[in-house]
Amino acid sequence: MGNTVAMILAGGQGTRLGVLTERVAKPAIPFGGKYRLIDFTLSNCVNSGIYRVGVLTQYRPHVLSKHIGIGRPWDLDRKDGGVEILPPYVGRHESDWYKGTANAVYQNLEFLEENDAELVLILSGDHVYAMNYNDLIDYHLLKEADGTIACMEVPIEEASRFGIMITNVDGKIVDFEEKPAKPRSNLASLGIYVFNYEFLKKVLIEDENDPNSSHDFGKDVIPRILRENLGSLYAFRFDGYWRDVGTLRSYWEANLELVLPVPPFNLYDPNWRFFTHTEEMPPAYVAPGSKVSTSLVSEGAEVYGNVFNSVIFQGVKIGRGTVVKNSVIMTRAEIGENCYLENVIIAESVKIGNNVRMGVGEDAENKLDPKVYSGLLTVVGMNSVIPDDMVIGKNCVIGIGVGPEDFKSKTLESGDYVIPREE
């Protein structure tokens, strides 16, 4: 079977990332100094020789759609094939919103027909990993499967966060449960599937006509295939690097893994490059007397202070006498002089004044949303302005577009938060 079409699910809201995803879809979140999350899935496609790609957008699609454009950075600006943005649409039977992952693909069966799909690769646009999809496809064809799911073993205490499967000795999936409270296995789905098109079309039409379905692959379609013995599903075990950066802690950790002496995720492999759409900027500048250690510093950055174990994105400016430790500083953020920042995530275009201390003090639970803002990280939303001489504790959150007038005093205790005042 030949023609493979990739469908990238890129409509996720990413609520566990808090202020980072209030204005952008999760796949558009910046990562690794210059990329956005979707770049890794798109690059995996073209590195695997897959040039027919649909990107299914939904929540806050503007930044993502602008980033992808016509696909030129990924060599996807093609007359035959290429990349196409596929938002929800109003049709005879469709709503104007994807009802679930399965419904999103169902609404675009016509796109698959137009591209003469024989195999359909269904991918998530918000994970960090490098995978040659041909290995998955070859395994799928070898097993003569109707569908194949990429998976990996995870610690059993984390298994309830994933779709969990049980297989026989031949790798055939015999049971699947989405995010079970008491997992019976630690073999977790990576949200990467390949299906024979005609089989997929049949089960999606049946699922769409099921009034009791939530139209989700993990919750509905896959369990039903197994329960009703509609076809054969196999598990493809992946042993490479894969991260779900769906929480602030996991996002921060995955970024800082990039600066390890031997990083588990290799951005520098000449045989498996990652492509992105990025602004042209001059080389990074590190001023005399500054110190940069165990960090990524991207083009356009100007460092006049000291940076340790951090990821510094494009166009960031760090003032004299400032120390940045264990932090992620996103594009065009500006940090003034004589500041101290530790264990912080600073979003795009934030301006921090002089003599600001952030990520210091006692540990405390966050008062805004302790389930989202945890792990003792302080997070600042895009376009915010932090005034001079502020002392901001651990586990704090500064909302999007916060200004100096929104701060009641020069001290923000650990666990506290500031959001913009309503007009």
Swiss-Prot record:
Its EC number is 2.7.7.27. Pfam families: Hexapep_GlmU, NTP_transferase. The keyword Plastid does not apply. Alpha-D-glucose 1-phosphate binds at residues 98, 163, 178-179, 189. Coiled coil: none annotated. The keyword Manganese does not apply. GO terms for molecular function: ATP binding; glucose-1-phosphate adenylyltransferase activity. Pathway: Glycan biosynthesis; glycogen biosynthesis. It is an enzyme of class 2 (transferase). GO terms for biological process: glycogen biosynthetic process. Keywords: ATP-binding, Carbohydrate metabolism, Glycogen biosynthesis, Glycogen metabolism, Nucleotide-binding, Nucleotidyltransferase, Transferase. InterPro entries: ADP-Glc_PPase, ADP_Glu_pyroP_CS, GlgC_bac, GlmU/GlgC-like_hexapep, NTP_transferase_dom, Nucleotide-diphossugar_trans, Trimer_LpxA-like_sf. PROSITE patterns: ADP_GLC_PYROPHOSPH_2 (PS00809). It catalyses: alpha-D-glucose 1-phosphate + ATP + H(+) = ADP-alpha-D-glucose + diphosphate. HAMAP family: GlgC. NCBIfam families: glgC, PRK05293.1. Involved in the biosynthesis of ADP-glucose, a building block required for the elongation reactions to produce glycogen. Catalyzes the reaction between ATP and alpha-D-glucose 1-phosphate (G1P) to produce pyrophosphate and ADP-Glc. Homotetramer. Belongs to the bacterial/plant glucose-1-phosphate adenylyltransferase family. This is Glucose-1-phosphate adenylyltransferase. It comes from Thermotoga petrophila (strain ATCC BAA-488 / DSM 13995 / JCM 10881 / RKU-1).
